[in-house]
Each structure stands twice: as structure tokens, then as C-alpha cells.
Swiss-Prot record:
Its cofactor is pyridoxal 5'-phosphate. GO terms for molecular function: L-serine ammonia-lyase activity; pyridoxal phosphate binding; threonine deaminase activity. One of its GO terms (biological process) is threonine catabolic process. The lineage of its organism: Bacteria, Bacillati, Bacillota, Bacilli, Bacillales. It holds the Pfam family Thr_dehydrat_C. It catalyses: L-threonine = 2-oxobutanoate + NH4(+). This is L-threonine dehydratase biosynthetic IlvA. It comes from Halalkalibacterium halodurans (strain ATCC BAA-125 / DSM 18197 / FERM 7344 / JCM 9153 / C-125) (Bacillus halodurans). Residues 332-406 form the ACT-like domain. PROSITE patterns: ACT_LIKE, DEHYDRATASE_SER_THR.
Length: 415
């Protein structure tokens, strides 16, 4: 399986058994009925720091010789890795410097400080993760501190692999499919290594954000490549460049990689919360969102999805609902030229909107000395089939309009 062997993961499990939570593997009735198969969720959202990252961080730090830790450790992260390192520093009583982008939400910064207590200092620097990463590495070299990589160190990968060991110990059935998210690749390479060693017939499916397909593109080109730009919405898995170690392992263990649209992930997050009271972060929900793209293959099979984390900022829920509605074809935005006369809005509501259509946004400024004025309007539909009926009525009434959903530049500017 490359650089990481099953024995490395067994050793990691011995290191971690009294530190991390052996998280539950739960059969999900809703998903099992929907896809006509047995779907199990590995609940890493119930881990100590609400994500799997504690496993690799603690195993890596605890394996470093004591004399090399005199000056402490340093890392860069915008979230879960930082919390894992902070918790490890506090538990092992090792000083740590954690570099985070200046754009990191205060809630995440506060969580890192909470887990690290007096052993950790958070340094906010740079506008992006890459900026923070480079500064952290330079700082570590200058101050002779040990750098803890989020995904590209062997002990990190072995630590994440203990998720797979727990899955195999807990499940009674043979696993046909394993769905796991890919960011830098540390989790899937560790989990996949263990599971493929025990169950070679299991198909390991990697799940990447459609807006950040770093592993898929690297595998396509046969080498690790760096993407020029990415959609950062799935913050736990949106990386420009995967790790060299995970890449080598993924070349051997992956059956397929599915690119999951961000809007589909948002729909899944909302469904998990509404149906099962599960709070999943975008990267954690991604493997579950991917099931839709394999619904024919997995029918009648045993499927495991690794729900990798639950550190979801509640302030993002409105944005997630919006992205979900747009992806499902239920939310549409237009700029419509309205006649500047009394009764025009009433006509629009009566003649254009359907009985179940709802106006969710309406912005209008009257233009003097003009017969028409632009209106920014948002319309939410009850079902996606209503869209064509809405457009038919809009065209029959002769309104001049532009669909913002179909214009990326306008959408990013106005919505």
C-alpha cells in the first residue's frame, strides 16, 4: 500500500486508544431506505475535537523524540488540524504556535485557544491558508520548532488510518463501498490502506469538492499538481495541492473519485440536520452527498460513509440554504425591467407568479424620466418543474429580463 503499512496503523491505534474517542459506526435508516442498501456512518463528528484530525496530530507529535520538542511544535491551519494540534499540545504539555489566516472566524480561533489552553499561541497572519502555511514553516525553521503538517507526514496518515481500523472492528458485514472525503488526502489514504489490507474487495470512493479537484487532477496527470484557483466553500477539503504521501497511496487504493457540487453538499447538510439532528461540516457531509451519484451501483450493498467532522459555523446556515435551493433548481434571481407606473408590481404577481411561487428578494429604485426601472428579484419555487412554467409566463407578458443564475459575474456581484 505504499509507505504506510497496516502495522503502522495498529501501532498508531495503541498510541491513541486512551486519547481519542472510539466513535460509533451507526446504520442510518433514512439513507438505507432511500438508496435501498445498508448505509453506515462513521461518526467522527463525535470525536474529541469534533473531527478526525486529533488522531493524526496526536500520533505525529507523540512520536517525536523529546529532545526535538524542547522548542515546541508549529502548524498552519484554518480549522480542524489546528484544534487537533492544540489539544495534543495541551495533553502532552508541549508549547505550540498555530498560524491561522486573518480571515479565520473568531469561533474557530476561540476553539483552538480553548483546546490548547496556556500551551498554545495563535498567530493570525496572511489572507489565505497558503500565506499562513508558508509563514509557519519559516517560523519553525527560524526558531527550531517541529512542523506538524496537516496531511503529508507518515505518522499523520497512520493516525488517520485508525478510523478504518475501528470501522473494520465494528462492522459485521462485508463492506462493498467506502466513501471518504479528500482534502489533502491524509484521511482517505490512511483509512483506505487499512480497509483494503483487510478487505481487498471493498471499493474505496474518494469524494472531492467540484470546486477543488486537486487529487482527481493529480491522478489524471500522474503527479501532484497545484490548482491555480479553488472554491473555498468546503473549507475542510478545499486545497490547491494534495500531499505526496497520500497521492502515492491513492494511486493504489482508489476505485474512483467523484466530484461533488457544493450545492449538493449543502442540501445534504440540511437533510442530515433536519432528519437525523446531525450537525455535519461541508467536508463531513460530502461522502453522503456522493451517494446520489452511485445510487444504482450501491443498491443492495453495504456502504460506509466517513462523516469526518461536525465543526460547522452556524452563521453559514443561511448561505448553505441558499446554495442548496439554487442547486436544486428552486431559487432563481432576475433583473427585470418594470414599467414605472402604478399597478405594475400587482400585474407581475397576478400574471407571472404561480400559486406556490414566493418572492424572497425585491430591490427597486425608481428612475425619474424613464419608462422602465430595473428590479432585482428573487423567486423561490416549490418544485423545480415550476421553473419552465414561470419562464413561459414571464415571456408571454413581454418583460425584459436577465437571469442572474446563468451569469456568474452578475451572480457573484449581486447575490
Amino acid at each position: 500500500m505504499g509507505k504506510i503499512q497496516i502495522e503502522d496503523i495498529i501501532i498508531a491505534n495503541q498510541t491513541l486508544k486512551d486519547v481519542v474517542v472510539h466513535t460509533p459506526l451507526q446504520k442510518n435508516q433514512v439513507l438505507s431506505e432511500r438508496y435501498e442498501c445498508n448505509v453506515y456512518l462513521k461518526r467522527e463528528d463525535m470525536q474529541v475535537v469534533r473531527s478526525f484530525k486529533i488522531r493524526g496530530a496526536f500520533h505525529q507529535i507523540s512520536s517525536i523524540p523529546k529532545e526535538e520538542l524542547n522548542n515546541g511544535v508549529v502548524c498552519a491551519s484554518a480549522g480542524n488540524h489546528a484544534q487537533g494540534v492544540a489539544y495534543s499540545c495541551h495533553t502532552l504539555q508541549i508549547p505550540g504556535k498555530i498560524f491561522m489566516p486573518t480571515t479565520t472566524p473568531r469561533q474557530k480561533v476561540d476553539q483552538v485557544k480553548f483546546f490548547g489552553k496556556e500551551y498554545v499561541e495563535v498567530i493570525l497572519t496572511g489572507d489565505t491558508f497558503d500565506d499562513s502555511f508558508n509563514e509557519a514553516k519559516e517560523y519553525g525553521i527560524k526558531h527550531k520548532m517541529t512542523f506538524i503538517h496537516p496531511f503529508d507526514q507518515e505518522k499523520i496518515v497512520a493516525g488517520q488510518g485508525t478510523v478504518g481500523m475501528e470501522i473494520m472492528n465494528d462492522i459485521d458485514d462485508n463492506i462493498d463501498y467506502l466513501f471518504c472525503s479528500i482534502g489533502g488526502g491524509g484521511l482517505i489514504s490512511g483509512v483506505g490502506t487499512y480497509i483494503k489490507s483487510i478487505s481487498p474487495r471493498t471499493k474505496v470512493i474518494g469524494c472531492e469538492p467540484a470546486g477543488a479537484p486537486a487529487m482527481k487532477e493529480s491522478l489524471k496527470q500522474g503527479k501532484v499538481i497545484e490548482l491555480e484557483k479553488i472554491d473555498k466553500f468546503v473549507d475542510g477539503a478545499a486545497v490547491k495541492k494534495v500531499g505526496e504521501i497520500p497521492f502515492e497511496i491513492c494511486q493504489k487504493i482508489l476505485e474512483d473519485i467523484v466530484l461533488v457540487p457544493e450545492g449538493k453538499i449543502c442540501t445534504t447538510i440540511l437533510n442530515l440536520y433536519n432528519q437525523d439532528a446531525i450537525v455535519a461540516e461541508p467536508a463531513g457531509a460530502m461522502p453522503i452527498a456522493a451517494l446520489d451519484f452511485f445510487k444504482d451501483e450501491i443498491k443492495g450493498k453495504t456502504v460506509v460513509c466517513v462523516l469526518s467532522g461536525g465543526n460547522n459555523d452556524i452563521g453559514r446556515m443561511q448561505e448553505m440554504r441558499e446554495r442548496s435551493l439554487i442547486y436544486e433548481g428552486l431559487q432563481h434571481y432576475f433583473i427585470i425591467q418594470f414599467p414605472q407606473r402604478a399597478g405594475a408590481l400587482k400585474e407581475f404577481i397576478l400574471d407571472v407568479l404561480g400559486p406556490d411561487d414566493d418572492i424572497t428578494r425585491f430591490e427597486y429604485t425608481k428612475k425619474n424620466n424613464k419608462s422602465n426601472g430595473p428590479v432585482l428579484i428573487g423567486i423561490e419555487l416549490k418544485c423545480d418543474e415550476d421553473y419552465h412554467r414561470l419562464m413561459d409566463r414571464l415571456n408571454k407578458k413581454g418583460f425584459e429580463y436577465r437571469e442572474i443564475n446563468k451569469n456568474e459575474s452578475l451572480f457573484n456581484l449581486l447575490i
